[in-house]
From Swiss-Prot:
GO terms for cellular component: cytoplasm. Keywords: Aminoacyl-tRNA synthetase, ATP-binding, Cytoplasm, Ligase, Nucleotide-binding, Protein biosynthesis. The gene is asnS. GO terms for molecular function: asparagine-tRNA ligase activity; ATP binding; nucleic acid binding. This is Asparagine--tRNA ligase. It holds the Pfam family tRNA-synt_2. It catalyses: tRNA(Asn) + L-asparagine + ATP = L-asparaginyl-tRNA(Asn) + AMP + diphosphate + H(+).
Length: 449
């Protein structure tokens, strides 16, 4: 008998009728009498293996019967087609070799567990179907981001994690004592350094972890999350919005192409993602967005997760989560809201020449109530105006002197944006909280594991 070694579970469909060897872990088992059903996983997928007492030596059947949940095992068996099975195949076991026995009872049993218990055991929960599916989608999105920007002619540009200054204000910074002499902060964004990169290379993007000391417990916030931040020079506000739409539609298409099995595990309605894959995202001004929100509130036409007493937004106020949710349900695909009041946006955003009260900025709001996934703007390129804005925010000019150099020498209109990776993954996968979209979430009350 020829045995094909080291076959991954996701490749079993290519070996129907053949005998293969699989290295896996036992997720669950059942059966009685002469038949045992073993549910196996190997990271690439899941498969059911059947052990019939008449087909294997007694010691193999007993070894299968004694297996404990999450014990590692090497299984040799024939691949059989079965339309009812996940992946369309199952494994008829001919031999089975357990690895080391577990040292204690595995804590995440097949019964239902609460989210706090599962997060306490996140290092083990990662092995189960739901996080497996979510994090494989994350991997797909990360790979697609890199591919997209490579195709668009960008270079990856690594920004530092330690920074002497704030880009989005000082209230959300993690402060670090540098040997008792100087203060530094964990970076809120790679944007400022990416601007330097754009003026050197034309098109750059940063991609890495970001840290915000937000004392928020909402389903949209983490203390540590990942952002992709492209910067382009020269570029306009219009160019920036076009790039955002191309990126997001590319990511959704790629997930639909590559992650059908993962989305099925999550029960995601892929029809709701199709419009986002097609592009043609609506664009409305901040003022137009307020009108849409007011109309929905006045008519009582509200999404299920928005309270009926929600108040309209006054002009000059930022959109809250309920207002973004209303906008997200008004459209069947992401909507770009542009030209917010400059007073509620960051100091580096270019004023609208047609109305200086406004900034040439935008937010992309995901549908189905997932809220903002992108924030971007054309950057101020005038030295005098940027210097005045920094001073107006009460920020130390000394910390931004290098940033002002970008306007002293070879300044040009340029633009960029930041996209929150976990928010995008939460929307695409249809999960309720972004804590599941990152392997080990860091929140106000959670630093372990």
């Amino acid at each position: 008998m020829t045995v094909i070694p080291n076959v991954s579970i996701d490749a079993l469909k290519n070996h129907v009728g053949e005998t293969v060897r699989v290295n896996a872990w036992l997720t669950d088992k059942s059966g009685k009498g002469k038949l045992q059903f073993l549910k196996l996983r190997d990271g690439s997928g899941f498969v059911q293996a059947t052990v019939f007492k008449g087909d294997v030596p007694e010691e193999v059947f007993e070894a299968a019967r004694r297996l404990s949940q999450e014990q590692a095992v090497r299984v040799t068996g024939e691949v059989r087609a079965d339309e009812r099975a996940p992946g369309g195949v199952e494994l008829a076991v001919r031999d089975l070799v357990p690895f080391a026995a577990n040292q204690a009872e595995y804590p995440i049993t097949p019964k239902e567990h609460g989210i706090e218990f599962l997060l306490d055991h996140r290092h083990l929960w990662l092995r189960h179907r739901r996080p497996w599916a979510i994090l494989r989608v994350r991997d797909c999105v990360e790979r697609a981001i890199v591919e997209f920007f490579h195709q668009e002619g960008f270079i990856r540009f690594d920004a530092p994690f330690f920074t002497p200054n704030a880009a989005e204000g000082t209230t959300e910074l993690f402060e670090i004592d540098l040997f008792g002499e100087d203060k530094a902060y964990l970076s809120q964004t790679g944007q400022l350094h990416a601007e330097a990169g754009a003026l050197a290379f034309g098109k750059v993007y940063t991609f890495g972890p970001t840290f915000r000391a937000e004392k928020s417990k909402t389903r949209r916030h983490l203390l540590e999350f990942w952002m992709v931040e492209p910067e382009v020079a020269p570029a306009t506000h219009q160019d920036n919005m076009d790039l955002q739409e191309r990126l997001v539609s590319f990511l959704v298409r790629r997930v639909l192409e590559e992650c059908a099995a993962e989305l099925a595990v999550l029960g995601r309605d892929v029809a709701k993602l199709q419009p986002a894959a097609e592009g043609n995202y609506p664009r409305v001004t901040y003022t137009e967005a307020l009108d849409i929100i007011r109309r929905h509130i006045a008519e009582g036409d509200l999404p299920p997760n928005v309270q009926p007493d929600v108040q309209p937004v006054e002009w000059g106020d930022d959109l809250g989560a309920p207002h973004e949710t209303i906008l997200g349900f008004h459209f069947d695909r992401p909507v770009i809201v542009e030209r917010y009041p400059a007073a509620i946006k960051a100091f580096y955003m270019q004023p609208d020449p047609a109305d200086p009260r406004l900034a040439l900025c935008d937010d992309m709001i995901a549908p189905e109530g997932y809220g903002e996934i992108i924030g971007g703007s054309e950057r101020i390129h005038d030295y005098t105006l940027l210097k005045a804005r920094i001073e107006g925010e009460g920020l130390p000019l000394s910390a931004f002197d290098w940033y002002l150099d970008l306007r002293r020498f070879g300044s040009v209109p340029h633009a960029g944006f930041g996209m929150g990776l976990e928010r995008v993954i939460a929307w695409i996968t249809g999960i309720d909280h972004i804590r599941e979209a990152i392997p080990f979430p860091r929140m106000l009350t959670r630093m372990v594991p």
